């Protein structure tokens, strides 16, 4: 199977936005990393956070997202990291999809690159902006966040 194309990556992202908006427990979807501003290159992966209405619905939402992805895509790798509330998928054409989960009331930006794709509550974008401004205000925290972002990118690619 050949490598994924940028058109395929866009189709997958559009599909995720579509099915996420339909779920009553998914409050917001946030693109993080390079996908929030247009991707680094044609091989960039999809990184996102799904904000849910409450932690009690975490398992149901994770199962829903996984089932929707498996309906349309073929995966050669899947890893669930429960303690980090993270799913990592690798499609058969090598598109990596990383999805984190958390309650929308805990929305916070820990890296500078993020974009709210939809927000049913109208509060996530502001919470992300406020939290990022706090990190930027403390230079050492901002530098730590930048280093963490670089380390994350190098580990995942």
Q: Where would I find each of the regions flagged by the language model?
A:
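Short secondary-structure boundary/capping segments within folded domains
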Residues: 19-22, 38-42, 88-89
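Short alpha-helical segments and helix-capping/turn motifs at coil-helix boundaries
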Residues: 14-15, 32-35, 82-85
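Conserved NTP/Mg2+-binding pocket subregion across the NTase superfamily
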Residues: 1-5, 66-157
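Short, conserved beta-strand segments within well-ordered enzyme catalytic domains
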Residues: 28-30, 49-51, 100
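Residue-level signal for beta-strand positions within conserved beta-sheet cores that form or flank
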Residues: 25, 44, 95
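Catalytic metal-binding acidic patch
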Residues: 33-65
């Amino acid at each position: 199977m050949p490598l994924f194309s940028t058109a395929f990556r866009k189709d997958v992202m559009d599909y995720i936005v579509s099915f996420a908006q339909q779920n009553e427990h998914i409050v917001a979807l946030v693109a993080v990393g390079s996908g929030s501003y247009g991707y680094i290159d044609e091989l960039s992966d999809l990184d996102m956070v799904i904000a849910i209405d409450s932690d009690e619905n975490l398992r149901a939402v994770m199962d829903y997202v996984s089932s929707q992805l498996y309906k349309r895509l073929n995966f050669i790798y899947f890893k669930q990291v429960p303690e980090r509330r993270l799913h990592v998928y690798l499609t058969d054409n090598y598109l990596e999809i990383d999805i984190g989960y958390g309650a929308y009331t805990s929305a916070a930006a820990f890296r500078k690159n993020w974009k709210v794709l939809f927000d049913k509550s109208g509060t996530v974008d502001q919470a992300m902006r406020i939290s990022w401004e706090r990190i930027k205000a403390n230079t050492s925290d901002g530098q730590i966040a930048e280093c963490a972002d670089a380390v994350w990118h190098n580990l995942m690619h």
